[in-house]
């Protein structure tokens, strides 16, 4: 049979593809409904479906394409550089329909020059022809990185905000999931979770491209079922809206605007590209204006853009800017996107809006503040930004002082040096600051804007043109240990902020098996594991393996992330049983465990007006003193009857200690964490 293959047609030529008679889908497969089957075969009267493989370098696009085709057509090998350097296609007959698989290089990599990206995008459009198309976003399990984010943003920017309606996510390296589930993996990555939320949980599947033939065919069947479902849910033509959106590849023109839902959240931003000189591959600088109400953020944005686009007016009673908005201009061959924002104190009410409009993160923050204003509450402002972007945001920030006109001819450097608050503010941000005079002439205004943009560009270059990415939600596992009756379950309920564990004063142990609960606090997921008293685990006297099983069960309730141990003791009642518990923990987990443990005293209310540290420093109980010394003095106390803000204050105090301990883990003790996991996995029991 004569066949032909297209491997990156020259510009203007018609793309050709090779047709092969191999039919994926023969034999038994998971059944699809008659409606699905009919939709797949007869959709819009077309006989051809194109599957466009998209993803970063090394994601496994070519291998996935080969799995779908049932034969090795696309070159696929492990390499530290890009193997696929041009678009190529191959066809196969599937369920009575011709399916064309299009393999692509990394179309959106910032490491590729704009000419190469432009050429590849053009070839991609040629291969799409006028048929229906489904996008397959390929991403490897366990390796979701900045390049994946770059790909998602590129798809949204080049193909259009409706792209997710035509998309299925294919996770490669299924074998790396081990015993974990795909959904647990997705839940651990905030941006990935947001992507799947918008695409739909039924529009993702897993591939192991190294599996045997039967398993690979089963994977393809599941993918085809997902495609059928997509075609039922989105009956409109697939290619036409994509082609309209992607026409931006040929140039932006004047006043091109789009808004709406995007891949990683609704209304990430609404780019408004102005001017005939806009090139779709033009480097972009995303600049986020931030500050308190009335400081002049919108006015600063208008000044930078050179036009009145953001609403500005003086108002003492209400916010003028109530929602995020963005506009752009071209400056020295770059598209500068200015994102105006409401006052920062409102961000904590809807952090998702911040992430949506700045995704994957701004290249620069402009902290706008009038030169003579009070800065007393700015620390509260910074804490909100840190929660979303992490401590690193300070390295991406420039302070923009306004109202230079109020200081006449005074030198800015002198004003800053003579004002402690201003001096401390500029030191916090590496002495990066600028000033605007809103009464300046047109020439002066253009000059101050040019200087600011040059300063921004210089700062961005110091970060290799990478943005300040939105930080992934962190996770902390807290394992509560201690004797029966010490208050572990009540403490767990306090941390979770709800009654998740049964807690009652009884003579016999209430908790007979480990259990867990989860909450999110200050952009951190916290998993709390309540445990029985291991020395009183039922059946251990006759069968020591029961204890091993319980410890394994305890650890299985933890999620991927740092594990912090909290020894729960009752204030004023340190017993011999408490001492035995600690001895047995050390015997089982090695003495190292005490270096990574926090001591939490319950019944804080019994202290009255006393101080916890006075209590621990002055205790005459030698065994307790020894334990506190081994824990390096990490102690806190809970009144588990507290509610509301007082309860939250206690929890935040514990998490502060735990995160400090976590930081020590990260910086110094990664090897010990692995050793601990190994020790726990092999525990046989040395309890007395």
Swiss-Prot record:
Give the residue ranges for region: G5: 208-210
Q: Which CDD domains match?
A: AIG1
Binding-site residues for GTP, renumbered to this chain: 55-63, 76, 173-175, 209
What are the residue boundaries of the AIG1-type G domain, all occurrences included? Answer: 46-247, 282-472, 473-677
Stretches of Polar residues bias are at: 31-42
What are the alphabetically sorted keywords of the record? Answer: Cytoplasm, Endoplasmic reticulum, Golgi apparatus, GTP-binding, Mitochondrion, Nucleotide-binding, Repeat
Specify where the region named G3 lies, as residue ranges: 103-106
Sorted alphabetically, the Gene Ontology BP terms of this entry are: regulation of T cell apoptotic process
Positions of the UniProt region annotated as Disordered: 1-42
Q: Which GO terms describe its cellular component?
A: cytosol; endoplasmic reticulum; Golgi apparatus; mitochondrion
Q: Where is this region: G4?
A: 172-175
Please list the tissues where expression of this protein has been recorded.
Abundantly expressed in the thymus (in thymocytes), spleen (in splenocytes), lymph node, followed by bone marrow and lung.
Write down what this protein is called. GTPase IMAP family member 8
